[in-house]
Amino acid sequence: MDNNKTKEGKTTHIFERPIAITDVETTGLDFAIQEIVEIGLVIINQKTLEIIDTLDVKVKPEHIKTANEFALKVNGYNETDWKNAITLKEAMSIYGEKTKDAIFCAHNVTFDWSFIFEAFRKTGIKNQMDHHRIDLFTMIWMKLRNSSFEKFNLNEVAKRLGVPEEPMPHRAINGTMTAYKIYKK
């Protein structure tokens, strides 16, 4: 596929494509075993940094027995709050449509992308995103590499940049909004 063409054949230069800032909450760290339980998404205009669209969706886990208890504590998962959660296939269908031709961005791109990629594969939903990835961690590292950090997580970076910290429990849309505010810096 031509790098400057959308899936419909429209010409869109890479610097004109939207950015899909994504955060996933999962039942653990291993994308091959654990599952997505929440997806947060902020689509922004790359030039203006204005928000175009958002997504905040809880996903019903199919194999909660494989969950890591610490992960569930961090993201606040509980059966009551997830009573009306949708299936992974439904969530990825919505996510896939919203992110069409967008460039994937995350604070920890390897982690979030591995779960999103696996979810596209598992559900059979076609990934129509641009093949490039933006790693917010790397962008921040370049800006703050001469600073001293005990931890280099999203909240520590937010504090350094004057962005409000993400509230706990860690929710996907809150992580995404914090990442968006950091991206704008």
Locate the predicted segments by residue:
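Active-site catalytic microenvironments for nucleophilic, acid-base chemistry
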Residues: A119-T123, M142-R145, R160, I182-K185
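Conserved non-catalytic scaffold segment of RNase H-like nuclease domains
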Residues: D2-F117, N155-H170
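Conserved protein kinase catalytic core
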Residues: L29-F31, W141, K181
